[in-house]
């Protein structure tokens, strides 16, 4: 055994506390050496162990009779969608790497989440991304945004996976801490799914497959578990470098090996590299491993055991073939031009042994390293931030109401604003057509993709209003769940399951931990009420700079299922017949906490829109029921920018005119700014054929929901809005020009 010992100072340098260093000595019965310290520091980092979040995450609802792989059981969540098929999905962050090296940081985030999906035997069919950056008027923010988007596009396009949707929110709070959350959805056959476990197969050989191992990404896991500082920007060696063409080969080879049933288990090498893959597979299978690092194919000469174990070089897998199938496995990977090298053996005693140059470099119980095993678990001190009691005192009635003649320009300004304008400059860089699975155009509320070989479809969405969760963490998180579910329901699909990416500040600061805890509580309560299992996800703490934490952002990734994609809904009606429009649900708009308030007054304050989980569920149930009965021709969720922005988006997307009369709504909402631009929950604009109006009304009113007549389609290419004391009209072209102008200049 390597004799070199390490000190408490070394442990602290690796991000471990004194208590944790003492615990490691108890586990080993001795002081660890440098290789062992490196392994523990990576595996016990926040990024790998979830040590400050796991006890909170265990309060989330995870049960469903459709669940095939739940939270923490495998690399991603999996749910049964019938016909022997499963939808496999997960979301993960790559925030810190993107802040330092945006192109590679964002690209490798896409690569990592793709591997989580295809290691389970699922072929990825679509990806999404949820992005947060500072105001691109500042050169550094523009650089981070444009380079990250290019990294996402280049990697995904090279893999041949269509982008099905996503979101972008720009705000000064994210200036030094961008958030890049990547989600991938795949489809697998039940009998061709793989596991990340040794399954107790003692004596089986362990192989490393894919790319070579280099020095890139060393300390990546611990790097993602610290606040960002000026020094962080110089830690580019902690950012991995991706090769999407290598990943494409690795995906095809892995899926072929899984389909031919050659494997006992397969695990992606992501955070903490070989350290994580060997320990997690061993612990899950209640075994150990004996690994010889001299056999690992290296990209760079003279790498020591510490570097090899902690390298996060991309496009690598650890696989355990069935006995007697080793030759066939190697042949498949060689056929695809990839390494496939035996590096060890599964052992019975539960110990992870690492050797190099004939010397034992590490000897650690595998269980002691992993989440759910010996990795530490904490609940931190909580303290309610004082600002939460201040922001609710804001009185929107003290803001002067809009005059009718200022509304047209206000709509134009909002349509061209950073958070509402067209995302075309982003999705033009993404391949949205590859694979022939996309059903709806980019820019819809939710993405809808066809499951190859079937009539079924998967609806996908990512959502979170970071301003809401900043102003009210508990209810803001509930709204994030409901908004994501509404976007899936707007396609006509039934919300099915949730994956989450929780982006917060330093958990050791009590105010930050309170906000995190409240968001988790809100997320759990909303999912329980809506009957949605949380299948897994990711926690990213330390999104904080010397100026403070980012707005808390619990990003919700939602999947839904529709029985026939041909019957899916769009934002706009596709029929050539005349249609009528109505506003349905629980319309209670407020300018508090709204995008309108921020753009017009520069304020992030006030009570967020009222949330009623009962009304949300009733509204979505009625909408889906109407879709199933063929009563609707379109559906558009109300969100940022309120009613007029939603109407403008309908006109822009459908390139058809709409005539609206707001007289009925004016009696309910007398303030013009709230009526036109206030934000609300549980509300959709739906369209239908005139003959179906009675049935549509009954579907919603029978559940105690409101139905307000808005107007009808028009032969004129314009949006016409009348009411008591006003008549506004915008041509479709003028709306489109404003909508397309917001982000365009930053990407030219």
From Swiss-Prot:
Its lineage opens with: Bacteria, Pseudomonadati, Spirochaetota, Spirochaetia, Leptospirales
Organism equals Leptospira biflexa serovar Patoc (strain Patoc 1 / ATCC 23582 / Paris)
Q: Name one GO molecular function term.
A: phosphoribosylformylglycinamidine synthase activity
Protein's job: Part of the phosphoribosylformylglycinamidine synthase complex involved in the purines biosynthetic pathway. Catalyzes the ATP-dependent conversion of formylglycinamide ribonucleotide (FGAR) and glutamine to yield formylglycinamidine ribonucleotide (FGAM) and glutamate. The FGAM synthase complex is composed of three subunits. PurQ produces an ammonia molecule by converting glutamine to glutamate. PurL transfers the ammonia molecule to FGAR to form FGAM in an ATP-dependent manner.
What does the subunit comment say?
Monomer. Part of the FGAM synthase complex composed of 1 PurL, 1 PurQ and 2 PurS subunits.
Which reactions is this enzyme annotated as catalysing?
A: N(2)-formyl-N(1)-(5-phospho-beta-D-ribosyl)glycinamide + L-glutamine + ATP + H2O = 2-formamido-N(1)-(5-O-phospho-beta-D-ribosyl)acetamidine + L-glutamate + ADP + phosphate + H(+)
Q: Mostly located where?
A: cytoplasm
Positions bound to substrate: 93-96, 115, 240, 312-314, 540
- Mind telling me what this protein is named? Phosphoribosylformylglycinamidine synthase subunit PurL
**Where, by residue number, does Mg(2+) 1 bind?**
92, 538
What family is this protein classified in? Answer: Belongs to the FGAMS family.
């Amino acid at each position: 055994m390597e004799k070199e010992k390490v000190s408490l100072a070394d442990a602290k340098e690796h991000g471990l506390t004194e208590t944790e260093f003492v615990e490691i000595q108890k586990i080993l019965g001795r002081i660890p050496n440098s290789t062992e310290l490196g392994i523990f520091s990576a595996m016990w980092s926040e990024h790998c162990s979830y040590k400050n979040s796991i006890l909170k995450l265990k309060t989330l609802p995870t049960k469903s009779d459709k669940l095939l792989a739940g939270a923490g059981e495998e690399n991603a969540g999996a749910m049964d969608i019938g016909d022997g098929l499963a939808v496999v999905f997960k979301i993960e962050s790559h925030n810190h790497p993107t802040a330092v090296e945006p192109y590679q940081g964002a690209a490798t985030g896409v690569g990592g989440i793709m591997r989580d999906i295809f290691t389970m035997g699922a072929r990825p069919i679509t990806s999404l991304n949820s992005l947060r950056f500072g105001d691109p008027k500042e050169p550094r923010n523009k650089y981070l945004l444009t380079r990250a988007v290019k990294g996402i596009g280049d990697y995904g396009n090279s893999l041949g996976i269509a982008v099905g949707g996503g979101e972008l929110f720009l705000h000064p709070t994210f200036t030094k801490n961008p958030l890049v959350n990547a989600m991938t959805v795949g489809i697998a056959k039940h009998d061709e799914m793989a596991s990340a476990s040794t399954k107790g197969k003692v004596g089986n050989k362990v192989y490393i497959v894919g790319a070579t191992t280099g020095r890139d990404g060393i300390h990546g896991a611990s790097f993602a578990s610290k606040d960002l500082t000026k020094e962080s920007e110089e830690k580019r060696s902690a950012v991995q470098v991706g090769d999407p063409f290598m990943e494409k080969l690795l995906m095809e080879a892995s899926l072929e090996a899984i389909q031919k049933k050659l494997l006992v288990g397969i695990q992606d090498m992501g955070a903490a590299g070989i350290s994580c893959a060997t320990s997690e597979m061993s612990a899950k299978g209640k075994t150990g491993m004996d690994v010889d690092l001299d056999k690992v194919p290296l990209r760079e000469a003279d790498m020591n055991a510490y570097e090899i174990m902690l390298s996060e070089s991309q496009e690598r897998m650890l696989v355990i073939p069935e006995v007697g199938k080793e030759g066939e496995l190697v042949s498949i990977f060689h056929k695809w031009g990839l390494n496939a090298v035996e590096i060890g053996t599964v052992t019975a005693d539960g110990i992870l042994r690492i050797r190099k140059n004939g010397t034992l470099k590490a000897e650690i119980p595998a269980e002691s390293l992993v989440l759910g095993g010996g990795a530490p678990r904490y609940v931190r001190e909580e303290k309610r931030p004082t600002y939460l009691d201040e922001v609710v005192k804001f009185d929107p009635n003290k803001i002067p109401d809009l005059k009718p003649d200022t509304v047209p320009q206000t709509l134009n300004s909002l349509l061209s604003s950073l958070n509402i304008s067209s995302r075309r400059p982003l999705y033009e860089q993404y391949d949205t057509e590859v694979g022939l699975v996309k059903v709806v155009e980019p820019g819809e509320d939710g993405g809808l993709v066809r499951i190859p070989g079937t009539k079924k479809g998967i609806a996908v969405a990512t959502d979170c209003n970071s301003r809401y969760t900043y102003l009210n963490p508990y209810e803001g998180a509930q709204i994030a769940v409901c908004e994501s579910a509404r976007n899936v329901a707007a396609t006509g699909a039934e919300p099915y399951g949730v994956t989450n990416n929780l982006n917060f500040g330093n958990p050791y600061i009590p105010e930050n931990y309170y906000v995190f805890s409240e968001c988790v509580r809100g997320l759990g309560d909303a999912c329980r009420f809506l009957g949605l299992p949380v299948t897994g996800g990711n926690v990213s703490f330390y999104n904080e700079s010397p100026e403070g934490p980012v707005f808390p952002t619990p990003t919700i990734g939602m999947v839904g299922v529709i029985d026939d994609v041909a019957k899916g809904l769009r934002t706009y009606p596709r029929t050539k017949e005349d249609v009528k429009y109505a506003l349905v649900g629980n319309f209670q708009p407020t300018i508090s906490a709204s995008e309108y308030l921020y753009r017009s007054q520069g304020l992030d304050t006030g009570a967020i829109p009222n949330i009623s989980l009962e009304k949300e569920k009733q509204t979505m149930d009625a909408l889906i029921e109407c879709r199933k009965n063929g009563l609707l021709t379109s559906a558009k969720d109300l969100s940022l920018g309120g009613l007029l922005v939603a109407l403008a988006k309908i006109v822009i997307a459908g390139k058809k005119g709409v005539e609206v009369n707001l007289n009925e709504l004016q009696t309910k909402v007398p303030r013009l700014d709230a009526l036109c631009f206030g934000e609300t929950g549980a509300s959709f604009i739906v369209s239908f054929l005139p003959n179906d109006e009675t049935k549509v009304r009954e579907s919603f009113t029978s559940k105690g929901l409101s139905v307000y007549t808005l107007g009808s389609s028009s032969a004129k290419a314009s949006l016409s809005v009348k009411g008591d004391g006003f008549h506004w009209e915008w041509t479709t072209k003028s709306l489109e020009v404003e909508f397309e102008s917001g982000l365009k200049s930053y990407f030219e």
